[in-house]
Amino acid sequence: MSQLCPCGSAVEYSLCCHPYVSGEKVAPDPEHLMRSRYCAFVMQDADYLIKTWHPSCGAAALRAELIAGFAHTEWLGLTVFEHCWQDGGNIGFVSFVARFTEGGKTGAIIERSRFLKENGQWYYIDGTRPQFGRNDPCPCGSGKKFKKCCGQ
């Protein structure tokens, strides 16, 4: 029985993010790493999240916090709306909206994530959360105002 990938690609999970999350393959670019990390949140795979965080971030110290967060969060969907590279292709950025429910409330993470490529492998470094006015267009591309979409 096939299952669509949680990353929103509309591709079967086994053909999409599973090879990265399982360690069979290394994500070839920041967008694939972002999508596979989202899948790891959905599937509650702290090991993959820690492995794909840049070593300088000390992600192993966040293991208990990650696992505790899994119990209270249901991920609803991911929309990637921009990705780009800099510094000869060794630094990448992915902008996205990740929707979730937590404690009965719906929310969204809107982030521009920064990735670094070292020794042929991409790592998540950090992210910034852009500020949007309530009447600005939603960055997810829905055509709605931010306040009526991801800003709820």
UniProtKB/Swiss-Prot annotation:
SUPFAM superfamilies: NTF2-like, Sec-C motif. It holds the Pfam family YchJ_M-like. It comes from the Bacteria. Belongs to the UPF0225 family. This is UPF0225 protein YchJ. The gene is ychJ.
